[in-house]
Amino acid sequence: LLAIGGYRGVITFVSLFFNIAVFSISIILMSWGWDPVIVTFASCLIIAYITLFFQNGRNSKTFASFFAVLAVLLLLFALSYFMGYGAHLRGVNEIMKYEEEIARLSPDISINMAKIAVSMIITGLIGAAMDASIAVSSAVYEVYNNNRNLSLADLFMSGIHIGGDILGATVNTLYFACLGESLTLFILFRNYHYSVLEVINSKAFCQEFVDIVISCISCILVIPLTAFAISYILKNLNRFEKYLPDDDLFIELDELREGKH
């Protein structure tokens, strides 16, 4: 990381440790009986804050991405609840994966497994949502930096077009990640001659399918939200100057002001 990324690589490494610490604390809180959904929401916000602001600084790109990710989290928590409870997800696949390790342990961990399933879905999508969001905001920022006469609508459409290119790769990444994780499950279905209906009605398959669907929805939603947020910020820079001390545009403005004096 130091050789390739330099100072930014070191910051990335440090922020990774902070994120691991946040995740570890969230597991401890859940084991103490705290609501898994609330803990997951809070931990995802902290992870997003660390990843975006600590790693990349407080600028218009990270500011827009953070609020787009926040909006997506709020929307998808409701959707995850609906789909998770509607599909009767209970975290079965995660438990079955480690059946050998927990064979001698009691399965009664006094935690609502339906909420754990929702937490798993949200935790799985936060990374992909941040990736897509920061990619769109960075691209729109560069478009504006090279042509500051563009209107808010022009910048927004630039973000949508860029997001469309990003979306295909992101969705494929999510799909193949889930497919690779569930490869043994699909081999099991094949060897035991499961019918299509039996596969669809399998709780293990259903959980993986819901994970993919909600993660893809998060990436679809975050692109227009980020495109609008970054476009609005860039066309209303004076309103946000005090919140974005690390933005190159404001540093440039400060240098121009000092030059005039």
Feature-to-residue mapping (PLM):
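Hydrophobic alpha-helical transmembrane segments of membrane transport and translocation systems
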Residues: 3, 7, 190-261
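Transmembrane alpha-helical segments that form the functional core of multipass membrane systems
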Residues: 9-94
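Membrane-interfacial helix-loop-helix connectors in multipass membrane proteins
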Residues: 30, 87-111, 187-209
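Pore-lining and gate-forming transmembrane alpha-helices of multi-pass membrane transport proteins
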Residues: 68-69, 107, 111, 115, ...
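Hydrophobic transmembrane alpha-helical segments of multi-pass transport and channel proteins
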Residues: 74, 78, 128-132, 166-171, ...
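Alpha-helical transmembrane segments of helical membrane proteins, especially in multi-pass transport
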Residues: 123, 127-128, 161-190
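Short helical (or helix-break) motifs at transmembrane helix termini and adjacent helical loops
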Residues: 127-143
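Helix-loop junctions and hydrophobic alpha-helical segments within the transmembrane domains
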Residues: 152-164
